[in-house]
Amino acid sequence: MSGIKKVVLAYSGGLDTSVILKWLAVTYNCEVVTLTADLGQEEDLDGVDDKAMRTGASRAYVEDLQEEFARDFIFPMMRAGAVYEGRYLLGTSIARPLIAKRLVEIARAEGAQAVAHGATGKGNDQVRFELAVNALAPDLRVIAPWREWDLRSRTQLNAFAEEHGIPISSSAKQYSMDRNMLHCSFEGGELEDPWNEPGPNSYVMAVPMEQAPDEAEYISIDFEHGNPVAVNGERLSPAALVKKLNSIGGRHGIGRLDMVENRFVGIKSRGVYETPGGTLIHIAHRDLEGICIDRETMHLRDAMLPRYAAAIYNGFWFAPEREAMQAMIDVSQQRVTGTVRLKLYKGNAWPVGRQSPNTLYCHDLATFEDCATYDHKDAAGFIKLQGLRIRGYKKG
């Protein structure tokens, strides 16, 4: 069909992508190669390659991409301080360009004519996958079965699976979940009513605040050029560091978010997110910037952040504007080296101390005590000049 002889499929091993695997082979009469990416989702991936092969794949890749994910995707985003709509730390969004990148690389190695994904026609992920492929390999076709087939319900998917001998899990999931080392998201079910409180099954990476310890914990995070490198003085690899902070933040109930967001496709959706380690990195990094980056550079970067965050959320990681913004951001991060001390208590994290060899904080200028460096009289001329523009503006 359409000259497609081989397709590379992003494969999780679940019902949807297992049905897609068989559907691709039957509908397109083609060879299907699968990619299962380990992004630190802490799922047991043993046997997922065997399941893919039994379902009809000609080859099954299961790849550990955790360090690349943390180093080349999470950390650049964290250096920018990216937050979508003022709240969301983009845990799902940032994973898609890496998966798409590997799909393209495997497609090239396998001589495939197309890649495929299991994202639905209502969500953002279809856009993210396909824009990434457009940027990296515009000659490859992208197949999105949810936009092509006639299967419209879970019952129909189960019937297709039974017809083709695909194993079906007996346990029904309460939520649609997506997890990687940075976060876990929950959608669907009772959450589709924005008035309903999330249930206990929406706690995976962080405990409810009521179950968090009754005593505060202090931790330190070290940064070099904007990247976190150590926790409590222990240097860790990027992936190990994120996981360490997930464990620390999670036990204090840190990083929970319940919000209604604006999808790129125009739909409002409710999501519940857990990002314990990412929240700690974000808070500490922002605080360290306060003593390392000058005012105008920081304000220029801050003005750009909504555009940067939207670029990631909307699927433009590989777009020239995101790369241009990243270049400016990374220049600003050259000075961001130092240590931040955080106090953690029942869902909250406060910076309580920071130090840097590149600090721009001057005690002699900031002190309320007598200071020979600063002459208070100089402020009068400064204020007078600043007032020229608005002088008389509101005069009756």
Curated annotation (Swiss-Prot):
Keywords: Amino-acid biosynthesis, Arginine biosynthesis, ATP-binding, Cytoplasm, Ligase, Nucleotide-binding. GO terms for biological process: argininosuccinate metabolic process; L-arginine biosynthetic process; urea cycle. Coiled coil: none annotated. It holds the Pfam family Arginosuc_syn_C. PROSITE patterns: ARGININOSUCCIN_SYN_1, ARGININOSUCCIN_SYN_2. GO terms for cellular component: cytoplasm. One of its GO terms (molecular function) is ATP binding. Its EC number is 6.3.4.5. Pathway: Amino-acid biosynthesis; L-arginine biosynthesis; L-arginine from L-ornithine and carbamoyl phosphate: step 2/3. It catalyses: L-citrulline + L-aspartate + ATP = 2-(N(omega)-L-arginino)succinate + AMP + diphosphate + H(+). L-citrulline binds at residues 88, 93, 124, 128, 176, 185, 261, 273. ATP binds at residues 10-18, 37, 118. The keyword Transmembrane helix does not apply. L-aspartate binds at residues 120, 124-125. It is found in: Cytoplasm. Homotetramer. NCBIfam families: argG (TIGR00032), PRK00509.1 (NF001770). Belongs to the argininosuccinate synthase family. Type 1 subfamily. This is Argininosuccinate synthase. It comes from Nitratidesulfovibrio vulgaris (strain ATCC 29579 / DSM 644 / CCUG 34227 / NCIMB 8303 / VKM B-1760 / Hildenborough).
